[in-house]
């Protein structure tokens, strides 16, 4: 079949969207992120119409189609218990056909591969898992992001870098912590120290409903 179908799966913040953007940049193709709230409709036939527009334009402009967190469209199909279920499965059948016929690149991202219907899984040429960075990789991410800051001083010792690297966070979460630390340090006209960074880490852990002591 024509085209290339790619599935990225893994926890939030592990780089799925960033990798899609890098791929587009390397191939010099625009990555079109599909807003599922604008595509999926409760009205019969509307979802197919919206998908048709997206695929037609993407084929004409040679876009890379990126279904970010596309579980609403690519999720497991329901049993035929009602007329609504039958229409939902018609949407799936239509989407399967458009994917089969699409000559370009399609990327789907999801947090859980098991959420994706097997009918779609069979059609992906590449399935890649994005995992959380290990402690060494986290240390490298912390060092890279904090060393790039120019608007204020960063005052963390080697021991403190090692300490913050012990907390399991995604690359996206570490980026959020660094941005929080930078904003707070600039607001108070102070250097970034371990206390501010720990505040940012706690904020991220609360978002994920994870409790820890630092």
Predicted segment positions?
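C-terminal alpha-helical "lid" subdomain
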Residues: 123, 135-136, 140-214
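Walker A/P-loop NTP-binding motif of AAA+ ATPase domains
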Residues: 1-163
